[in-house]
Amino acid sequence: MGQKVHPIGLRLGIIRDHRSRWFAKAGEYPALLAEDHKIRAYIVKKLASGGIADVDIERKADQVEITIRTARPGVVVGRGGAGIDELKANLEKLIGRRQIRINVVEVQRVDAEAALIAEYIVGQLERRVAFRRAVRQAIQRAQRAGVQGIKVMVAGRLNGAEIARSEWTREGRIPLHTLRADIDYAYKIAQTTYGTLGVKVWIFRGEILPGAGGPAAAPEEVAAQPKPDQRPRRRKKIQYEERTDEQ
């Protein structure tokens, strides 16, 4: 089942944390869930050039706290904080909430984030770069960032072919069945002249060992953890005794 389910959803509560953290009454859950979707969609669309890796949302009474993980904090904050003020005002109009707090967190290892790698591939495909070249360059960037494995799948009318197909490339290990494996996953859509292309990216950043880190541990903490002993075990020698049939 590790090959079929969402890699992040499978690890929720084990090594990953939820992107939306709040509780509400039974009748309010659908409206608040739709509100979270609107917030994320607006931020991703408004800050398309900001390299948004993830958006976390927390709710406390009437206050909504939004944490934006981005590769370009300067684009999000703007000159003198003007970008944050404008974003906050627009979100208040969108959801009708009075108190909105926005935190901006810079991503340390940009090329170790699946969302940013997928966004890079989408940008190359929309500029009519050959998909194999775009995938190869993305894999090289991820390997330079120190990831232990990466898998990229592109589907659609590749290079303008009449029949749609899917191709994938993998470098390193992607242990989808291992729950302690820190695997990041992202899915993006590229709008090309021949139609839409789907891009999926899996990145294996290492294992989170028991006691070494909790849910949503940073990639830097995962990389600093010691690797388990991988020395091959010696097989025990079996002694055989020669037996002769004596009459």
UniProtKB/Swiss-Prot annotation:
Residues 215-227 have a biased composition (Low complexity). Keywords: Ribonucleoprotein, Ribosomal protein, RNA-binding, rRNA-binding. One of its GO terms (molecular function) is mRNA binding. PROSITE patterns: KH_TYPE_2 (PS50823), RIBOSOMAL_S3 (PS00548). Part of the 30S ribosomal subunit. Forms a tight complex with proteins S10 and S14. It comes from the Bacteria. Belongs to the universal ribosomal protein uS3 family. GO terms for cellular component: cytosolic small ribosomal subunit. This is Small ribosomal subunit protein uS3. Residues 213-247 are annotated as: Disordered. Residues 238-247 have a biased composition (Basic and acidic residues). GO terms for biological process: translation. It comes from Gloeobacter violaceus (strain ATCC 29082 / PCC 7421). InterPro entries: KH_dom, KH_dom-like_a/b, KH_dom_type_2, KH_sf_prok-type, Ribosomal_S3_C_sf, Ribosomal_uS3_bac-typ, Ribosomal_uS3_C, Ribosomal_uS3_CS. Residues 39-108 form the KH type-2 domain. Binds the lower part of the 30S subunit head. Binds mRNA in the 70S ribosome, positioning it for translation. Pfam families: KH_2, Ribosomal_S3_C. The gene is rpsC.
